[in-house]
């Protein structure tokens, strides 16, 4: 659905540009890897911080650049749009193992030429045992080796990738320009007492910052020269004028402050792009775009330098350019990040720091531009609050109707107080933005990696608890073991064993994350990212060393609903009503419900026990009780930046499992809720597939019983409706009322919608050529349906239509 009558259509050239980008096959790109290798080889005598700065300098000064015929913005990540650069300093392991498999994947396919394969093989020897993954794995203690061997903790994203889940200080960048950062760095460097041992690392850091600022300026000047060269050859007068203006802008920003809307957009794009050339961490987000860009928009509109149509076309160009950024993941990593997502989040709406509605004219323009482009990037989030502009809320619902899973809605009424309770200043709490999927942070002030990556698998752990601490799938011991299910005379015994085991597993997850974070801090400091995050320059530390103002990490879990439903079935059918014996249930699980008698047990588990998502306290409270040990335990453990400067340095809970419910399900045996072995688990805090039978209000009530004020890392809720359900204005108003109740009264944290019919999805599986730009909401992000694996497609189809 396009609804051009409501939102208007892309300009002809932006429509053509969009199609060109969508038609690009994603290829593996070796250029960055070659340049990075050369830089590392040339600077082996340098401290790692300086070596990383010189690496970025080498890349930005030598990488291929181009300006597309239809673009209004300059800047590219790779030799072609949608190509995925390689980051060998993180790992070459999966790249070499999968060189001949990238094109054969059943999802997240990448293409690769024989020349590229050889180029990557040529540089590989230098990186053997000389990258983050190698050093991280060597650093890990034996105590957690079993979890890495079995893939229980999903650390692929941390060992293979860089800085992620943050937004730099775009308002300050636009106001001061990088020249302002340069001046502050020079002043800090000049003020150091070099007899103080603490000044040694600071000296190196400040010099590295100056290197990358100059490198960014050089990069922009290369585009300025290219735009001028293209202008000289351009026959069309209007396009020649555009190229000359682009040349002028690139000669100015981001080094100098932006003074117009066009300059501000180009400056932001350069930084957003270069951060993802420096490092391949995903979820590099734009922050509160409508707030920091509005002064430039307003001034240009008032002066007559800009029309609304000009701004709209420029933003659609920005979003198309945003889609060109790509990332190659290992096959294992794609199981938790299906659809090649980059999670580049744009946040609009919300409140000002003086607690007024923050919606402005640019908020509407951003909505319209995203509606016109209908792409998977950027990830659009709207901050909801009880006084949100009603017309703006109406427009949000209209965008949802388009069926590409945006915008997601975050609730100020729960998130802001939660941040304040954790020690975030009130002013900063009111300025939060979405980072990546559902995670939130204060843009420009938040530390490295605001989300955990270990994905504690609740249903798999429950089976482990029932098996005296031994994992059913691998046969390995995960936790100490507190008895077998057959010997547990009461439900309280099972819950006591669950409590102790979950705390133990939580501790193991922290060990893994801290050791890998320390390896990342030592091996791959990212200098530009640090420089653009407050207060790294003031402290003389990288973001991974504790340079940010705040630093909190949220833990992640998978299968919350399966856990609750499993406990519900065990309590009711085994212990309370004694319709199934402990031995019968355990044997049925081991049999995967295959025999006729075990199929009957499966039927009872599915049909005769309360299910999460139906506003039934019997099961909802079990979910809350079983989750409580994790919430309590995770906050006990500091992260590697604790007491090194930032406010916080600790952990809290979060439920964003992205698409790990599919990958983690592949390693999980049959569960007591009646789920078959190796099928997907429930995602986020959403009910299990087809378990919610009483409509969306009941789902909202079940989800809201979770202690959302303590799950500050995000409470991700996916919902699905058919397009027909929102066809009438009356039904759209009903949805608005439902969301208001969820947020205002029930204190829900987040909700997002897939507005697509089951029939459309099934037809897209059968006839993918007819649905090349069909977009679905996977978890806290949207993806093109056709690039997803069959397992993930089936998982999305199976989600209940409300």
What residue ranges belong to the model's regions?
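Conserved catalytic cores of very large enzyme subunits
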Residues: 2-206, 242-245, 249, 253-802
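Extended non-globular scaffold/tether segments
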Residues: 207-218
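Extended, structured, electrostatic nucleic-acid-contact surfaces
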Residues: 228-229, 297
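A conserved hydrophobic secondary-structure block that centers on an alpha-helix together
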Residues: 230-240
